[in-house]
């Protein structure tokens, strides 16, 4: 059921809602004292924007004074001495983006005080996902029947806001839920700004609606039970008054708790593990790890993902696109992270260092695998025989012993192998390649293990020792031949 538009509080980005914003001289005095908090800075920036946008030609004595006054107001808002061109551009884009939103969404997003267009877009995405689940149609207009006073009923004034957007209310009860804890200084939805040093008197063009005769200090400054009391709304009919908090519950409207809770530091807490996050999108992505929700499905293969960005990365597998190219060698990659990892081959950068032995690695995954050498951790266990491994690739190769799978085949002779490295070593037989060179003599080998055995000739090392007679050997194969002597004697 839709509702009349007048049940929504006007917001700063509705140009037809505001006539004038007056800010008392205490603002300059308080700002000169320095040490603005983040909340005070946002309030000051919004007040400056409103003064600039609602300046009237009649306030100046002439065109030159009007132009100079506008220029000064613009500088107070955009602060070119403190902001770069990109930051100023971001402010302008953010304002235009908020102004282009549907009024219902615009009111809620504006209350969150987004600092950038990207942050505002994330907030819109979060809200629309919740509303989509409720079956809300942003293009639907309120019907005449839904707006009739007789349909609402005098005994149920909470129906005015309770039915907005398929049951998700953006009315006064939602305002209270969006406020910082312990704060009655700021109305979370109406867009009005309250600071200790700034007093704003806001007058609206609209001549109808629930707030037309309500003083500003009664709309946003009440706290506790007095916020929605009858004395706070003396000029409203019973149908226009905001719903009492005991008749409306935000949890009931959503069906669950709200997606995240607004606070002064914009931090959110996971209900499952109590972990804190700085943004709504980060919290929602984290919560999907508990519920294992994967709403983003690939139309090609049906694989589902918890984030739309992960789906976009996956779809490159089907398209074969590799837009990220290395400027050094021309090799292309489907993901920018893969390009970054590849570029470390050219730069020699190894930013990941082991705290135990100091060894460095170019990839974080390589460091994680290496650290298991120190911890002895072997998290990957074979279901067939129980043997455990420190790396998943080693487990995969081992499992082929049980399955008999040999997916790597030599094109020259047709011989098949269970792992890729074995095929590479085999291919050197056909190519004659011997990449492992002895530093003492000019002899070269096709396999690194053969080079290690050869180097023992120069070093004299004999690590393989017979437990029966104590004789030592440089190769394990030589020890096996020697052991047969003892076996023959015993027989």
Curated annotation (Swiss-Prot):
The modification Phosphoserine is found at residue 9. PROSITE patterns: SCAN_BOX, ZINC_FINGER_C2H2_1, ZINC_FINGER_C2H2_2. InterPro entries: SCAN_dom, SCAN_sf, Znf_C2H2_sf, Znf_C2H2_type. GO terms for cellular component: nucleus. It is found in: Nucleus. Residues 49-131 form the SCAN box domain. GO terms for biological process: regulation of transcription by RNA polymerase II. Its main location: nucleus. Residues 134-161, 204-249 are annotated as: Disordered. Coiled coil: none annotated. Pfam families: SCAN, zf-C2H2. One of its GO terms (molecular function) is RNA polymerase II cis-regulatory region sequence-specific DNA binding. A zinc finger (C2H2-type) spans 268-290, 296-318, 324-346, 352-374, 380-402, 408-430, 436-458, 464-486. Keywords: DNA-binding, Isopeptide bond, Metal-binding, Nucleus, Phosphoprotein, Repeat, Transcription, Transcription regulation, Ubl conjugation, Zinc, Zinc-finger. Residues 225-241 have a biased composition (Polar residues). May be involved in transcriptional regulation. Belongs to the krueppel C2H2-type zinc-finger protein family. This is Zinc finger and SCAN domain-containing protein 22. It comes from Homo sapiens.
């Amino acid at each position: 059921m839709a509702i009349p538009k007048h049940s929504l509080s006007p917001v700063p980005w509705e140009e037809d809602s505001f006539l004038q914003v007056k800010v008392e001289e205490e603002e300059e005095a308080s700002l000169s004292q320095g040490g603005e908090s983040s909340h005070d800075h946002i309030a000051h920036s919004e007040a400056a924007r409103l003064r600039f946008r609602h300046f009237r030609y009649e306030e100046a004595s002439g065109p030159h004074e009007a132009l100079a006054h506008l220029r000064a107001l613009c500088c107070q808002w955009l602060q070119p001495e403190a902001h770069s061109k990109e930051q100023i551009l971001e402010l302008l884009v953010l304002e235009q983006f908020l102004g282009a939103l549907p009024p219902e969404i615009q009111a809620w997003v504006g209350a969150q005080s987004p600092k950038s267009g990207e942050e505002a877009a994330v907030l819109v995405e979060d809200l629309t996902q919740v509303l989509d689940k409720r079956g809300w149609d942003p293009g639907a207009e309120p019907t005449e029947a839904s707006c009739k006073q007789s349909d609402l009923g005098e005994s149920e004034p909470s129906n005015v806001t309770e039915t907005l957007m398929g049951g998700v209310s953006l009315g006064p009860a939602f305002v209270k839920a969006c406020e910082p804890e312990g704060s009655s200084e700021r109305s979370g939805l109406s867009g009005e700004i309250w600071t200790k040093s700034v007093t704003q008197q806001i007058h609206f063009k609209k001549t109808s609606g629930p707030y037309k005769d309500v003083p500003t200090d009664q709309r946003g400054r009440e706290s506790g039970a007095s916020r929605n009391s009858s004395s706070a709304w003396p000029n409203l009919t019973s149908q226009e008054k905001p719903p009492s908090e005991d008749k409306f519950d935000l949890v009931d409207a959503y069906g669950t708790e709200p997606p995240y809770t607004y606070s002064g530091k914009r931090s959110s807490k996971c209900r499952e593990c109590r972990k804190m996050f700085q943004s709504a999108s980060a919290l929602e992505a984290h919560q999907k790890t508990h519920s294992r929700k994967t709403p983003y499905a690939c139309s090609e293969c049906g694989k589902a993902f918890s984030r739309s960005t992960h789906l976009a990365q996956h779809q490159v597998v089907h398209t074969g696109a590799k837009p990220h190219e290395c400027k050094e060698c021309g090799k292309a990659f489907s993901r920018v992270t893969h390009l970054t990892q590849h570029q470390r081959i050219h730069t020699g950068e190894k930013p990941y260092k082991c705290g135990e032995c100091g060894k460095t690695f170019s990839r974080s995954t390589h460091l994680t695998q290496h650290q298991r050498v120190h911890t002895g951790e072997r998290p990957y266990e074979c279901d067939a025989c129980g043997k455990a491994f420190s790396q998943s690739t080693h487990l995969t190769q081992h499992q082929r012993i049980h399955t008999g799978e040999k997916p790597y085949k030599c094109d020259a002779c047709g011989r098949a192998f269970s792992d890729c490295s074995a095929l590479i070593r085999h291919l050197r037989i056909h190519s004659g390649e011997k990449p492992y060179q002895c530093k003492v003599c000019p002899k070269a080998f096709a396999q690194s293990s053969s080079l290690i055995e050869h180097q023992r000739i120069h070093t004299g090392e004999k690590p393989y020792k017979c437990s029966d007679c104590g004789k030592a050997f440089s190769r394990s194969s030589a020890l096996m031949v020697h052991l047969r002597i003892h076996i023959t004697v015993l027989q």
